[in-house]
A protein has these predicted regions:
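Terminal peptide-recognition signature
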Residues: 15, 23-26, 51, 95
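Flexible glycine/acidic-rich beta-alpha junction loops that bind and position SAM and/or redox cofactors
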Residues: 158, 193-194, 214-240, 260-283, ...
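Radical SAM enzyme core and accessory elements
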Residues: 5, 275-460
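PDZ/PDZ-like groove recognition
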Residues: 1-10
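Short, surface-exposed secondary-structure edge patches
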Residues: 14-19, 41-42
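Conserved Radical SAM active-site core
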Residues: 60, 67-213, 222-252
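PDZ-domain C-terminal substructure recognizer with occasional recognition of PDZ-binding tails
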Residues: 41-77
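Conserved PDZ fold ligand-binding element
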Residues: 17-35
Length: 460
């Protein structure tokens, strides 16, 4: 069956009113061939549409539809993309998927590198598998912003790091995007002694030359698990080397701020934690454009928590039951600080923070999002947890109550004997959770896009 075949029709939608039926295949909108979700969303935006459908017997029919500008037609297809996701053509020396243990669910080993997922879901792509036709389509459809894994603009070094002889050509694609005003948010996974130092200076300089099309740059330290046998030998950052990268990026950012009014580049929070330095203040991160890469995440969390706490009356907090928070090693001191602030306002607040050492991936992995259910159970069983356990929601797979190791929240609750509440990366929600106020269940927070993509991704 064609992936543009209609799987369901929203009964309250323009498509239903026009008489589109399940099983028909969408072929054209206003004369434009529909290949995937980008074509569908772009060409169905207008208020007046001429939709061509192919019926199961091979015959075609055309419908004229009137709707609100930007209103969705109301069609669901076999997959979210209306096509197969494009897999990565690289063999990056730092690829995290290559460092995962065996025996995990198959979908976790799929490496996507798809421009459509970059635009729709915020995924990062390397641009190495884009054909000239696809590059032109991004320009023609104004697909923007896109998130680009750059790593280095040195063409030879990029080919070496991505283990793809054509990887350097992607810099030319970026320059073409910049000339056509396609906005790009860029990521640099920094590997000690490889693409930092002078190579990082060149990368920042070259990307600044594409400003304002290059809208932001994040520099994040490479993650190294214990599963690297047979892989490229990588080292990790220590206090001194992490500090050197911070100085380098902050120096560039200060010069760019003076010249163009924006810092453009930021180190992730993890670099500051590795270097043992205080995180920059809220205003340093400007619009927080790189939160998904951990840039300014803890600063924003702290500021949101402060504001929420200011609005909270002590009597609202008085009924909070004793609790504990499980998180990654790196974030634990910051959460302890937030609990202390809550306790200063209301002396009855009783909470503990437990930093979970990552035995599943290796102790060098200290972020909360990679903590597994098995490690939670092993390290918290028999500990004083109070009456409830709070965990960051990013420990769980999107839309599920399941950790990366397939241990469920129900398993953890049963083994530890306390209810588990997943809290989003949001200071207001964290404050409510600490104070014992009800927060919105995960299932109700899911957007339609997350649901559709997750259902698709399960079938990869």
């Amino acid at each position: 069956m064609s992936m543009t075949a209609v799987k369901s029709v929203d009964p309250r939608s323009p498509a239903h009113r026009a008489g589109i039926r399940v099983g028909e295949t969408l072929t054209h909108i206003n004369g434009h061939m529909i290949v995937d979700v980008l074509d569908y969303k772009f060409y169905s935006y207008d208020p007046r549409l001429e939709v061509t459908l192919r019926e199961r017997d091979g015959s075609t029919r055309t419908l004229r539809i009137r709707k609100g500008e930007g209103e969705d037609l109301g069609l669901e297809f076999e997959t979210y993309l209306m096509d197969r996701a494009r897999s990565c053509a690289n063999n990056c020396i730092f690829c995290f998927v290559d460092q995962m243990p065996p025996g995990m669910r198959p979908s976790l080993y799929f490496k996507d590198d798809d421009a459509r997922l970059s635009f729709l879901m915020g995924n990062y792509l390397t641009l190495t598998n884009l054909s000239p036709r696809e590059v032109q389509r991004i320009i023609d459809l104004r697909i923007s912003p896109i998130n680009v894994s750059v790593h280095t603009t040195d063409r030879a070094l990029r080919a070496e790091m991505l283990k793809n002889r054509r990887a350097g050509e992607s810099i030319d694609i970026m320059e073409r995007f910049a000339q056509n005003h396609i906005t790009m948010n860029c990521q640099i996974v920094s590997c000690p002694g490889i693409n930092d130092g002078p190579a990082l200076d060149k990368t920042l300089h070259d990307l600044a030359g594409m400003y304002p099309a290059v809208n932001s740059i994040s520099v994040v330290p490479v993650g190294v698990t214990k599963y690297r046998e047979g892989l490229y030998p990588l080292t990790i950052y220590n206090t001194e080397t992490a500090g050197a990268v911070i100085d380098q990026v902050e120096g560039f950012a200060a010069r760019h701020l003076e010249r163009a009014g924006t810092r453009l580049a930021w180190c992730s929070d993890e670099f500051y934690l590795l270097a043992g330095r205080e995180l920059p203040p809220e205003e340093y991160f400007e619009e927080f454009t790189q939160l998904d890469n951990g840039v300014g995440m803890l600063t924003l969390l702290s500021r949101e928590f402060d504001r929420a706490l200011d609005l909270m009356e002590p009597e609202e907090m008085a009924g909070a039951t004793p609790f504990s928070i499980a998180t990654g090693v790196s974030a634990a001191p910051y959460l302890e600080r937030l609990i202390s602030q809550a306790r200063e306002k209301c002396g009855t607040i009783e909470g503990r923070v437990y930093p979970i050492v990552n035995h599943f991936f290796g102790e060098t992995i200290t972020v909360a999002g990679l903590v597994t259910g098995g490690d939670l159970i092993h390290q918290l069983k028999g500990r004083e947890l109070g009456e409830r356990l709070l965990i960051p929601a990013n420990m769980l797979r999107s839309g599920e109550r399941v950790f990366l190791d397939d241990v469920s929240v129900d398993d953890v609750e049963r083994e530890l004997g306390v209810p588990v509440t997943a809290v989003e990366q949001d200071g207001y929600e964290l404050c409510d959770a600490i104070c014992g106020l009800e927060i919105t269940p995960m299932a109700q927070r899911q957007s339609q896009e997350e649901t559709e993509y997750y259902q698709y991704n399960q079938r990869v």
